[in-house]
């Protein structure tokens, strides 16, 4: 059980004009690197995203379920579900599955009237955060976030801070590495930075 939870560093940052989510791309089982190309940040809807640290299969299963639920919500209500409502829905799903849980720690981020970020544990516990981190490198990432975060941070600055947090975790945590996935969610919607953009920012 503990083996499934090893590996990964994910980071979330609320900015004045959006939210940033970032994660490394390594998947590991125990001390073995299973993949160097795993995506751990996902688009759920136009202005909604999820990042997960833990069992890749469980994360993907939850993502598929949430995408189906938000499509159903759109069909019934005629608009996108709010970030808070998606966090509540995810919390209910996780709590309902607590005896056969989704093995992971999840970050829900999005933009409706304002940017918002929630962290959820596998039992459905939910916390709204200005910034957070999850996974094996979270302590290293938190140190960077706590040092660099400010209330009026913008998305451009948030992107750089998130990359710095993942980069530091990659240097010190053997279960974190092999590149970075980074997305922003703003009033304009969900956007994933490409590899060239990330490499340029890391220089």
Curated annotation (Swiss-Prot):
List the GO biological process terms. proteasomal protein catabolic process
Q: Which residues form the propeptide?
A: 1-7
Q: Which residues cross the membrane?
A: none
Q: How is its activity regulated?
A: The formation of the proteasomal ATPase PAN-20S proteasome complex, via the docking of the C-termini of PAN into the intersubunit pockets in the alpha-rings, triggers opening of the gate for substrate entry. Interconversion between the open-gate and close-gate conformations leads to a dynamic regulation of the 20S proteasome proteolysis activity.
Keyword tags: Autocatalytic cleavage, Cytoplasm, Hydrolase, Protease, Proteasome, Threonine protease, Zymogen
The positions flagged as active site in the entry are 8 (nucleophile)
Chief location:
cytoplasm
Describe the task this protein carries out: Component of the proteasome core, a large protease complex with broad specificity involved in protein degradation.
Task: Please give the HAMAP family that the UniProt record associates with this protein.
Answer: Proteasome_B_A
The protein's matches in PANTHER family, at most eight in alphabetical order, are given as: ATP-DEPENDENT PROTEASE SUBUNIT HSLV, METALLOPROTEASE TLDD
Identification of the protein by name:
Proteasome subunit beta 1
């Amino acid at each position: 059980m503990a083996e499934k939870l090893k590996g990964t560093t994910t980071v979330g940052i609320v900015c004045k004009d959006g939210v940033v989510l970032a994660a490394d791309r390594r998947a590991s089982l125990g001390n073995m690197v299973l993949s160097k190309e795993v995506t751990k940040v996902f688009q759920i809807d136009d202005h909604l995203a999820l990042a997960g640290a833990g069992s890749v299969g469980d994360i993907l299963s939850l993502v598929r379920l949430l995408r189906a639920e938000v499509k159903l919500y759109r069909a019934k209500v005629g608009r996108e579900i709010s970030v808070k409502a998606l966090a509540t829905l995810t919390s209910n799903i996780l709590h309902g599955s607590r005896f056969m849980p989704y093995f992971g720690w999840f970050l829900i981020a999005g933009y409706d009237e304002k940017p918002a970020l929630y962290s959820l544990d596998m039992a459905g516990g939910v916390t709204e955060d200005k910034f957070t981190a999850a996974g094996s490198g979270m302590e290293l990432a938190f140190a960077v976030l706590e040092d660099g975060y400010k209330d009026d941070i913008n998305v451009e600055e948030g992107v750089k801070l998130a990359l710095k947090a993942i980069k530091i975790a990659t240097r010190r945590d053997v279960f974190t590495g092999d590149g970075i996935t980074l997305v922003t969610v703003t009033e304009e919607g969900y956007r994933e930075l490409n590899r060239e953009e990330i490499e340029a920012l890391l220089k």
